[in-house]
């Protein structure tokens, strides 16, 4: 019953907003089989974050690709879950204007979301660190799996996934901040809200007088600022919100 009441409240807040956005983190993709980073079964419990740093990539590109090709393969095998499709549906209904994500799996776009800001890049693309030529990561992954220890461009440059590694600047942060400044409601979904500067996006909306809904399995540093904090499973909760929105539409 509590889930139903929470979902109805979120539906009402979305319907009463003019410019709502979603801000998503790794937690939205765990139901797709992708581990998050900082949770009990998170990626950084198994590996050192150093492996995903630009310094490590530059010093040890062979070891980096050995690590990242395994991660890349698991991401390619993942499919969008009901939460991704729910956000795409909310955008199609005109109820959210953008999805700002920390994820590199590309699942929001696969699910049908159009206006997606990928702050940490997209692992489905790779590029040459010398000439900047773009590559399909599936092609690069196939080469690594066939034994190419360090995948290289035709020019000889080392290829790199088009993702933001630790020590690199975030993609599109100013565009994300512009969108946040124009928003009156943000749904922070599946994010620990600990990674700067991405974690400033929900705060911008809140500081401008907008609403903040946090949907996450673990506590976050911003729970105290939120209008609603929800601990339900994301892939179950968001479709429930859609159902309530449709019900409220029918009754109005």
From Swiss-Prot:
**Keywords, comma-separated and alphabetical:** Cytoplasm, Metal-binding, NAD, Transcription, Transcription regulation, Transferase, Zinc
Q: Binding residues for Zn(2+), per the UniProt record?
A: 128, 131, 153, 155
The answer to whether UniProt assigns keyword Transferase to this entry is yes
Residues annotated as binding nicotinamide are 37, 104-105
Residues annotated as catalytic: 120 (proton acceptor)
Q: Which InterPro entries does the record match to this protein? A: DHS-like_NAD/FAD-binding_dom, NAD-dep_sirtuin_deacylases, Sirtuin, Sirtuin_cat_small_dom_sf, Sirtuin_class_U, Ssirtuin_cat_dom
Q: What is its EC number?
A: 2.3.1.286
Kindly list the GO molecular function terms attached to this UniProt entry.
Answer: histone deacetylase activity, NAD-dependent; NAD+ binding; zinc ion binding
Where does the record place the Deacetylase sirtuin-type domain? 1-248
The name this protein carries in UniProt is: NAD-dependent protein deacetylase
């Amino acid at each position: 019953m509590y889930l139903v009441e929470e979902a109805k409240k979120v539906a009402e807040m979305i319907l009463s907003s003019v410019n709502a956005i979603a801000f998503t983190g790794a937690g939205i993709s765990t139901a797709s089989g992708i581990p998050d980073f900082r949770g009990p079964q998170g990626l950084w419990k198994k590996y050192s974050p150093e492996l995903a740093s630009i310094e490590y990539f530059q010093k040890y590109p062979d070891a980096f690709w050995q690590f990242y090709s395994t991660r890349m393969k698991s991401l390619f095998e993942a499919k969008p879950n009901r939460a991704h499709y729910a956000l795409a549906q909310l955008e199609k209904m005109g109820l959210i204007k953008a999805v700002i994500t920390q994820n590199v799996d590309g699942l929001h776009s696969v699910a049908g979301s159009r206006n997606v800001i990928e702050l940490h890049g997209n692992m489905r693309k790779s590029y040459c660190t010398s000439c900047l030529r773009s590559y399909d990561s599936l092609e690069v992954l196939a080469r690594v799996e066939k034994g190419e220890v360090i995948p290289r461009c035709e020019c000889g440059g080392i290829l790199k996934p088009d993702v933001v590694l630790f020590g690199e600047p975030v993609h599109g942060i100013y565009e994300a901040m512009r969108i946040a400044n124009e928003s009156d409601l943000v749904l922070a979904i599946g994010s620990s809200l600990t990674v700067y500067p991405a974690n400033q996006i929900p705060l911008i909306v809140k500081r401008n007088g907008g609403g903040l809904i946090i949907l996450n399995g673990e506590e976050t540093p911003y729970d105290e600022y939120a209008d609603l904090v929800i601990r339900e499973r994301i892939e179950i909760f968001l479709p429930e919100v859609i159902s309530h929105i449709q019900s409220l539409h029918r009754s109005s």
